[in-house]
Amino acid sequence: MRGTTENTDLFDPKTQMDPDFTRHGSSSDGDFGFAFNDSNFSDRLLRIEIMGGPSDSRSEVEGCTSIADWARHRKRRREDIKKESGVTISDIVACPEEQILTDEQPDMDGCPGGENPDDEGGEAMVEEALSGDEEETSSEPNWGMDCSTVVRVKELHISSPILAAKSPFFYKLFSNGMRESEQRHVTLRINASEEAALMELLNFMYSNAVSVTTAPALLDVLMAADKFEVASCMRYCSRLLRNMPMTPESALLYLELPSSVLMAKAVQPLTDAAKQFLAARYKDITKFHEEVMSLPLAGIEAILSSDELQIASEDAVYDFILKWARAQYPCLEERREILGSRLALSIRFPFMTCRKLKKVLTCSDFEHEIASKLVLEALFFKAEAPHRQRSLASEESASLNRRLIERAYKYRPVKVVEFELPRPQCVVYLDLKREECGGLFPSGRVYSQAFHLGGQGFFLSAHCNMDQQSSFHCFGLFLGMQEKGSVSFGVDYEFSARSKPAEDFISKYKGNYTFTGGKAVGYRNLFGVPWTSFIAEDSQYFINGILHLRAELTIKRSTDP
């Protein structure tokens, strides 16, 4: 019907709208579902021409029952279109403004029904492509549908104010002051695979809801919403997808959305949820080593961006990234590019050991200039006073770059000062947060990263023990030597801790021990108090929530008294 042809246009082009179109598809937007495709509440007729072609099988589209099916079909369709015309779907998505006829487009006199510019029966063509018959008489953009034909036509009564309120695309179409904005017939040309999604999108613009419930169907609607600039529908679909059970396959697909759509901000919450899912699933990468090694770059970045990564140390993160990069990018130049521009941001160099930082400087996988810059930044951070380090970390915690934020390492970082004269000696500082100590109860333990003295590796370990004499839990500290050969030698050691009110290091225990590989020595109750007193809010050993421990080691020589 064309009963609305004689009516006054319901849409006033001069009406000012929110430029960001920030509606959220909620009930507060009002439900105009009753007006959908009803001539009584419409001022225009939308003609949808559905194109058929070698890449558009409806049965194939409807057969997508999973995210993996959807991704495979979308990839296959993109490749088919590229073969047919050399133009990809991303080219179409990137140029939505070309779908609207402007002054630079061919004169309408050369188009069907264009002899009389004032004839309201003329159509404002808003097309994705032209058929082969029209190509010789028009210079419209060709988007890879030369072999397609119109296999079906749908006509819907639409309300321009409703569509324009939801979509900048339709707003521009209906208010550009040109002839097509005054006409009552508007034609869209779409692929057969897009038909269901477009109908859902149009229905959403009236009712703020969609009827589809599967992830593949919601993704189709989301992509259609992006093409026609309906941000509220993109947010709505993103929210529904976010509430569905996620899988590694779906999470990886969601990570790609920002680079596949124009309105990336609308899908950011979904992308963030995908990152959180992957980070939580693979937080202990040693348990899923083969699976993680096969993940794409975006998945690796999501996992390694987490503060909760359960890994021995940042040295282990560095080693894993090198192994993954060498497997995924055999070409050295490509690997250097990916490491320097992307993956280096996932390595928290300030928390690597100095021994490993030395290896970074000589690693051929990194450009030398980049490696030098990263190592220098790490060393400067290590040289800062603790309060300054905390200040720098807090400043960076609000940013996307979290290289100065310490992870929950299995082996806690230590600071080491070494002396060679008058005898081999080192002073080791280990800081533990109150929460870390609290997590040790009733029988846990936490280890420090290894440090070296006299060519041998040592470590500290903090325990929650049962005091054998008094039968209560207490805090213990031990010094161990890494198992390496049968070497044994004597070490003088002293354990100290800062305590209130002076907050100076106070010696707790000292002794000497002849170490052999794998042995450890220490004190089951370092502070001589029950666990409850040690961990209490008014404990004298926690300063601003941090327990500061120090161990001094000196190698005994045979000539020493």
UniProtKB/Swiss-Prot annotation:
Q: Where is the BACK domain?
A: 268-360
Disulfide topology: none
Molecular function terms from GO = protein heterodimerization activity; protein homodimerization activity
Any one biological process term the GO annotation gives? response to abscisic acid
**In which pathway does this enzyme or protein participate?**
Protein modification; protein ubiquitination
Which GO cellular component term is one of those annotated?
nucleus
Q: Please name the SMART domains in this protein's record.
A: BACK (SM00875), BTB (SM00225)
The UniProt regions of compositional bias labelled Basic and acidic residues, in chain numbering, are 11-23
**Region entry Disordered: which residue ranges?**
1-29, 103-122
Against Pfam families, the record matches this protein to: BACK, BTB
Q: Is the keyword Cell inner membrane assigned to this protein? A: no
Q: Which residues form the BTB domain?
A: 145-214
For this UniProt record, the keywords arranged alphabetically read as follows: Ubl conjugation pathway
Chain's role: May act as a substrate-specific adapter of an E3 ubiquitin-protein ligase complex (CUL3-RBX1-BTB) which mediates the ubiquitination and subsequent proteasomal degradation of target proteins.
Reproduce the free-text note on domains from the UniProt record: The BTB/POZ domain mediates the interaction with some component of ubiquitin ligase complexes.
Name this polypeptide is given: BTB/POZ domain-containing protein POB1
Q: Which organism is it from?
A: Arabidopsis thaliana (Mouse-ear cress)
**Upper lineage ranks?**
Eukaryota, Viridiplantae, Streptophyta, Embryophyta, Tracheophyta
